[in-house]
Each structure stands twice: as C-alpha cells, then as structure tokens.
C-alpha cells in the first residue's frame, strides 16, 4: 500500500488541472453598460450577479465578449456553456434552458424636470411626445396605444440620442431602463445637464426579467442550471443581490428607486 500511495498522488496531480477546468463556466456575452461591459472591473451589474451566483455553487466563470447575436447563436450551437444575460421569449424557451431571473430591469419614464410629469396609466401620457427606440419591445399595451394613435411618439436611434433629444426639448418623455439612464448620464452629460432631468418612480412594467441561457444538448447544462439557481437563491437571500443592484450612481434629486422585487416572482421579458 505504501508503494501505491506515490502513484495515486501522481495520478491525482495529473487529474487536478482537468478537474479544475471542468468547474470553469465559459459564458458568451456582449456590451450593454452598466449591466454587461468590459469597461467595468466587475464586468457589469448583471454579470457580477452571474459570477457571484456561480461562485456560491463552487464554479469559476470566464466571460467572452462578442456581438449579442453571435453570443446567442454560438451558445445555441453548444460552443459555450452559457450566455448572459437575456430576456425570456417563447423561442428562447424552445432553444435553451433558462435560469431563474437574474434581475428585473427597471423601465421608467424620464422627462424634463420642469414639466412635472405625473401618470397612473399609459393613456395619461397622450399629451406628451414620447421618444421610442424602434427595436425595443416596451410593452404590448404601449404599442397598442401607439398604433391606435393615442400616444404621440418620436423615433430615435438609441437611448443616448433619446436623452439628448429630451435636453433639446424635441421630446417630452423617454421610456428607459433606470440604470442604463444613470450610466449614460454619468458618462456623456454634465451634472448640470443631468439635473434638468427627472425620473418618475412608477415602473412602466414589472415583467422585464432577464436570464442565463444554457444549451440543452451539452451534458452538464442541467447540473450547471441547478447549481446556478441554487447560488442565485443564496445571493438574493443574503442581500448581496440587492447591494449589487444599487452599485450604479444616479443623479442627485432623482426619485427613489422602486421597491425591490423578488426576481423569481415576475414574468418574462421579450428582448435582450
């Protein structure tokens, strides 16, 4: 037995790198500051949540940045262990295993502070010019009202252009994800410009949930999904998830963030 021990230790030493590599989760992702970005040390709010959830389950994570469409296609083909982070859709539920909710995006209405925007229902916005990004889903009700002519919209290329239109008074209201707005204002506008804008505390919808996608054909996908969901539950129950979600600074004087919601309790988002 004494002679077998050195051989056993040698074999274990050879196996250890492969065993460690098997615990590393390779994740395809893209740029969407502040949620997913190479410009932040933590790689963004959403990716930090993904990293910490896997870490609590004993996995190391490596993120690989690429165009979003490529990330989804290559993950579907099984070239990556997972892709983060994505909205739910019927097609993605057919193509992938979807995790529990990573985070609920906070879509709110930004306006010039001087107009003192108040609203209870979308119909209340009928007298304002609303900036919209054509490729965004928003909500089915929102688009029904637009098609019925009950909301006035102005097409714009992206969120940054929408914020600039607000300051130029070319639009009155911009639906935008709260943390995306905060990040853009911090990086592209002066404090004086940001101070001209207000955000209404009411959420446009509470169902913009986002998820980790895993290819169902890979042998370990089901185990990784279970491990991730377990780690995510720990992250939420410990309060760390909520702390990560508040890591983006917003302009002074903005309305308080909406009350935290249980990410597992909301419905699906339709777009990434």
Regions found by a protein language model. Name each.
Residues 47-56, 210-244:
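Extended ligand-binding regions for polar small-molecule ligands
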Residues 48-59, 100-101, 124-126, 135-157, ...:
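Ligand-binding cleft/hinge of the Venus flytrap
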Residues 69-80, 97, 160-183, 187:
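Short helices/loops that flank or line small-molecule/ion binding pockets
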Residues 51, 64-124, 135-138, 201-205:
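Acidic, polar ligand-binding/catalytic clefts
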Residues 24-38, 121-138, 233:
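Short loop->beta-strand "edge-of-pocket" segments that line small-molecule binding or catalytic clefts
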Residues 29-31, 104-108, 191-229, 251-259:
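Periplasmic-binding protein-like
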Residues 137-151, 193, 229-272:
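Ligand-binding clefts/hinges and TM-proximal coupling segments of bilobed small-molecule sensing domains
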